[in-house]
Amino acid sequence: MLNLGGPALAGNPDAGKTKAEQKCAICHGPLGLSQNPGAPNLAGQPAIYLVEQLRAFRGGKRQHQVMSIIAKPLNDDDISDLAAWYASLVVSVKQPQ
């Protein structure tokens, strides 16, 4: 059973986009598609998953040299907004011919 302790999906994607441009794009790409092999793609990920991961980094349950520092000052609204933004991005795959 997954309990995130509050509204996880009520974020504002527009606010999330602004926050992502400031805090996330350098590693995860401006549209959540990373060119950095050490940073995962975030575009199209389920909001509930992103909320859980950001809260884990913020709370110290999950450790990463960069993400732990970035997530620490995020409040629940920041996390919900970021999750809503990345979850709203549609990822399409071009099939090889």
For the regions a protein language model found, what residue spans apply to each?
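C-terminal capping alpha-helices of c-type cytochrome domains
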Residues: 2-4, 48, 53, 62, ...
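N-terminal hydrophobic or amphipathic segments with adjacent small-residue motifs
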Residues: 4, 10, 23-26, 38, ...
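Sequence/structural segment immediately N-terminal to covalent heme-attachment motifs in c-type
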Residues: 9-31, 43-45, 49, 94-97
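C-type cytochrome heme c attachment motif
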Residues: 21-30, 40-41, 52-55, 78-84
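N-terminal, post-signal-peptide region of Sec/Tat-exported proteins
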Residues: 34-70, 74
